[in-house]
């Protein structure tokens, strides 16, 4: 199994349009960026997406993904679902898994496109391409939102999705002891109503007993990537994690 971070940015991405802060200027000058959040899960020749970002067309083209087996949506904010429209006239009847309430919220925007709704309840496991997934509630007010637990061949990966640090105990129990925790962390510090900061995300990783932590959904509040990576385990676009032979292997995008 392979997991790739297709986008590690927050809703406006980095660099932000019309922003001339140090981080955005560094991104323009040096040619790096943070596309909007999406994760690619690969098993054999099958591809599964966790969220469909506004940058999805580019993300799929640049990673030679011609067809996806399924999509999982974590919540109804545009930076996590709006790229699904890229499947229009490209791939019909994509299977989409999420909770009934999230399906209802996103479905209002997707009436031009036919897809197969797969409604799953929180804490109810389901399989796609021999990988087991479980959705669990997180805290991203005011919308309903879920994180994703991924299990394959004894490995466990947890994606927090967008959430603040106030996650309920039942969800925390579901998240325990992951081999890899992909945690949202919009800024290095500060208090945010909808998101964790890096320090909160790192504390969550320690509490869960995560073997490895990578931070995603990162805003331009961080210093430029090279400097930020010396302070925190910040993810980068197209970073890959391979699971096999009892080990986790990590590779970075170009």
Region annotations inferred by a language model:
Residues 1-62, 144-161, 180:
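Conserved beta-strand hairpin/beta-sheet module of binuclear metal-dependent hydrolase folds
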Residues 49-53, 69-77, 97-99, 157-163, ...:
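Active-site neighborhood of phospho(di)ester-bond hydrolases with catalytic His/Asp-centered motifs
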Residues 93-146, 152-153, 235-238, 244:
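Metallo-beta-lactamase
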Residues 44-98, 177-180:
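Active-site metal-binding motif and surrounding structural segment of the metallo-beta-lactamase
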Residues 13, 81-82, 106, 190-191, ...:
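Glycine/Thr-rich phosphate-binding loops of Rossmann-like dinucleotide-binding domains
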Residues 53-56, 78, 101-102, 138-143, ...:
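Short beta->alpha connector loops
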Residues 17, 61-62, 83-86, 108-110, ...:
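Short amphipathic alpha-helical segments
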Residues 166-252:
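Cap/insert and terminal regions of metallo-dependent hydrolase folds
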